[in-house]
Amino acid sequence: MRFTSMIFVLVVILINSLFNFNVLASSVIETTKNDVCSTPCTRRYGTYECWHDCLHERYNDGGCVDGRCCCKK
């Protein structure tokens, strides 16, 4: 029973990694000439945190776009 459970867990991990390879490969996304998107937005890292980090990095504005924090020059 434990062996079967372990195999099931490993198969789930393998399948999950196959579906997420595109997300991991693109760490920086440019939405326009003035936008730089890098950090993923989550429940704990939302629009306010993104905006704050963009201002700290000397961008004029920032917000979550398509699940990523995008900073505007």
UniProtKB/Swiss-Prot annotation:
InterPro entries: Defensin-like_dom. Disulfide bonds join C37-C71, C41-C64, C50-C69, C54-C70. Keywords: Antimicrobial, Disulfide bond, Fungicide, Plant defense, Secreted, Signal. GO terms for biological process: defense response to fungus; killing of cells of another organism. Residues 1-25 form the signal peptide. It is found in: Secreted. Pfam families: Defensin (PF24552). One of its GO terms (cellular component) is extracellular region. Belongs to the DEFL family. This is Putative defensin-like protein 57.
